[in-house]
């Protein structure tokens, strides 16, 4: 059984596939080799494997390279290069490219207008209603900026904060290794309250899929353990906490803003 990263985001009652081009085995191996090298603190190997993947135009490597430039992982921090790589991922059809552009532009208020403009481009991204701009407006950059400038004081900052946190959580979500190893599918709900700077998480459903090959009693016991059964929720919770630490919550965020996203993990 193979996973084609089936992480769907269920927003406002409608299903939205986390779109990305089909990932080949070679691309998965390339990404894994970069992760392994970083974990070993072998930056020379990480950069070498990264460059090999970029030469082969692997979409996932574009995202990985962008993250490494954005966060200064084995590379000198360079937002302009990160931005170009996220744009390449977006052009190749990977939805996370847009989400990382939203988060990156929102981070440290790098470019608030650009953050919200990209948020409008992301199909179905969860945003508070006051943060939305009609398509005829956001399709015209000048009108879009004028619309943002007409907002009440504090609304732009509040919207950028909500968009940035949500985009980082959803853009960074991958199928966690533990769930893959134990063939778990399921759905996890995030409720983000921007005014509190907090997210609540709950597991809606967990499904243990048939495991192929010889399966030991120890493996089955581990699979039913709390650690494994909650691996999807714990993985997403860690990502949510990490995103909240990256953004400074503005003083004036409406108390009634709530964003709900359901992450649906499945195999195909």
Over which residues does each language-model region extend?
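Alpha-helix C-terminal capping/termination sites
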Residues: 39, 71, 75, 91, ...
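Charge-biased low-complexity segments
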Residues: 18-30, 44-48, 52-53, 80-268
């Amino acid at each position: 059984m193979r996973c084609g990263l089936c992480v769907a985001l269920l927003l406002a009652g409608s299903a939205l596939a986390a779109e990305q081009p089909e990932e080949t085995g070679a691309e998965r191996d390339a990404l894994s080799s970069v992760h392994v090298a970083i974990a070993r603190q072998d930056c020379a190997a990480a950069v070498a494997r990264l460059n090999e993947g970029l030469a082969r135009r692997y979409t996932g490597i574009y995202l990985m390279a962008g993250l490494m430039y954005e966060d200064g992982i084995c590379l000198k921090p360079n937002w302009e290069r990160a931005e170009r790589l996220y744009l390449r991922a977006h052009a190749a059809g990977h939805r996370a490219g847009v989400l990382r552009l939203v988060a990156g532009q929102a981070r440290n208020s790098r470019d608030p207008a650009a953050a919200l403009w990209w948020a409008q481009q992301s199909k179905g991204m969860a945003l508070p209603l006051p943060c939305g701009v009609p398509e005829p407006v956001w399709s015209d950059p000048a009108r879009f900026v004028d619309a943002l400038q007409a907002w009440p004081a504090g609304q732009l900052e509040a919207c950028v904060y909500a968009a940035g946190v949500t985009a980082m959580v959803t853009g960074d979500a991958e199928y966690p290794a533990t769930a893959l190893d134990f063939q778990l599918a399921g759905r996890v709900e995030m409720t983000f309250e921007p005014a509190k700077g907090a997210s609540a998480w709950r597991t809606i459903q967990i499904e243990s899929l048939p495991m192929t090959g010889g399966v030991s009693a120890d493996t089955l016991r581990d699979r039913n353990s709390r650690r494994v059964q909650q691996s999807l929720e714990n993985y997403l919770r860690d990502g949510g906490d990490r995103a909240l630490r990256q953004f400074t919550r503005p003083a004036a965020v409406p108390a009634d803003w709530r964003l709900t996203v359901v992450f649906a993990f499945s195999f195909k």
